[in-house]
Amino acid sequence: TYTHAIRPTDDGHCPFLINKLCHIHATRGEHVKPLICGLFPYSFNSTPSGVYLTVSFRSNAVLGNAGTPLTEQIDTLKEKFAVYNTLYTARSVIWDAIKLTVDKPITWEQYLDYEKGILAALTREDLSLKEKIFAASDSLFKDLNKPPMPDTIAPPKGLDKKFLAGLFALYFPNDPKYLNKDVVFNGISFALDLALKSPKFKVVNRSYSFEELNNFPWPENNAESKEIDDLLTRFLYSRVFGKWYFGGGFAQLSVIAGFHHLALLMPLMRMHAAGLAIARGAAKVELIDVMVTVRQLEEKVQEAVLDGYSAALWELILF
């Protein structure tokens, strides 16, 4: 969402961060900080129905669901939006080619109706996170012919695992030199990787199979598991509400492909968090592993760029 940034140090941190505090803020006050720092963690997305505000999950307060509710910060948010407009007046987001699928264009008003179904599914308290995602996906197919859901979900096939491994390598690069680089999907090289490379997932300099990470224990039916589900649900809800997953909000993908990409981020985060837990010597995934994972993914996914071939490939695989 941002086109300007302060160049980070080799360890990925701001050069003005000292003892986990902003040196400029601590010594000179908030009013002299760079404008881009003052905007964090707010993100503004201008759409045909208005400006939608979300907050970045790179913020510790957002990750922990702490701080003052946005509804109680209206005056501050108006000031932040005015600053945002001074930095990004030249940036235009194109929303005039919205599609439910590649061959089904829809109006913005029709999209908002579909979005209601997604958000309603994500806020259902009687469903697990997986069931919420399935229900949200089903709501997008209400006007399409969708094959019935099988009684049991088959394990991922070879191509599915390769696609996940390709996305995993781009969103969670193991080489530190790629941590601070934007994610650029080259369709041809991505397709070659799908065909030629075995599906391996690297976390903290160790390679794992899909099964090793997917089968690693997670907390179940306790307070921590609820916190994890809440964090992941909030992440999904924020991307949908902010329109950061399709069209002008993400690589001009169709709504269905864009949402299914969001859905795929869940197993990617599950595997990365498992890898972090294994590296710590833990017996199961803990909330801290998921928080670190969500923060890294947020940074990468918000700056992802797809070329035309990649977008076409995603539309095919993610329908």
What are these regions (language model features)?
Residues 2-30:
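Structured, beta-strand-rich domain cores
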Residues 112-319:
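Hydrophobic, aromatic-lined core segments that form the binding pocket/scaffold
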Residues 28-127:
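Internal, well-ordered alpha/beta segment that forms a basic, Gly-enriched binding/recognition surface
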Residues 5, 39, 43, 58, ...:
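Residue-level preference for alpha-helix termini and adjacent loops
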Residues 27, 104, 255-259:
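Short, charged/polar micro-motifs that form catalytic or ligand-binding hotspots
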